């Protein structure tokens, strides 16, 4: 399970990740044609900023979050608006994802909150199960690169990311980026639902 008191965080307003603006790396990915409007799942949608931004651009979006209060706040933002956007409370590791499959899954800093390798691998399996064949997952992940810091996103290495994701999905791109709202290094990880299983490593004889 992730941090046990997400609902308390939303109740207190202690939300350094919630800037009220769409994630710049997502905006760049969409506006440069990385993905066109499609059925989309956002995991860890929080108060809905990114999901709503996508819906405003023609995406059909389901945003899920483990915090009922976050979901309540997200729903309030779209009340009375003519958007293909909805929100649901979901423990992503433990429950089936409703309304799938999807062509695109997005998470900003949700995958990286899980400390155990088995949890991160389970997260990737859940994403793969929610995608159509060839569907894309964009995950923005705190990085072990950069200067030491005492606050900010959890840090994960490229190796930890690959070990969790590669059995379930094909990594298309893993590059250094930045969480601009935190001035912290990040990984931009784009993966694709496999159409054939990954093959085992081979020896050079």
Q: Model-found features: residue ranges?
A:
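Class I (Rossmann-like) S-adenosyl-L-methionine-dependent methyltransferase catalytic domain
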Residues: 1-41, 47-99, 114-130, 135-205
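A conserved beta-strand element that flanks and buttresses the S-adenosyl-L-methionine
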Residues: 106
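Conserved acidic residues
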Residues: 103
């Amino acid at each position: 399970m992730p941090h046990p008191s997400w609902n308390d965080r939303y109740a207190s307003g202690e939300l350094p990740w919630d800037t009220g603006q769409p994630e710049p790396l997502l905006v760049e990915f969409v506006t440069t044609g990385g993905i066109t409007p499609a059925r989309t799942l956002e995991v860890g949608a929080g108060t809905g900023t990114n999901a709503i931004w996508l819906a405003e651009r023609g995406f059909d979006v389901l945003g899920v979050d483990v915090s009922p209060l976050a979901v309540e706040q997200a729903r309030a933002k779209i009340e009375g608006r003519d958007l293909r956007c909805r929100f649901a409370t979901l423990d992503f590791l433990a429950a089936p994802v409703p309304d799938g499959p999807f062509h695109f899954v997005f998470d900003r800093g949700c995958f990286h909150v899980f400390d155990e390798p088995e949890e991160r691998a389970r997260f990737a399996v859940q994403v793969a199960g929610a995608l159509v064949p060839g569907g894309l997952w964009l995950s923005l992940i705190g990085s072990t690169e950069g200067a030491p810091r005492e606050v900010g996103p959890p840090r994960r290495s490229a190796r930890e990311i690959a070990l969790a994701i590669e059995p379930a999905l094909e990594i298309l791109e893993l590059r250094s980026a930045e969480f601009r709202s935190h001035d912290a290094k990040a990984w931009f990880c784009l993966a694709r639902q496999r159409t054939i299983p990954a093959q085992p490593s081979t020896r050079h004889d």
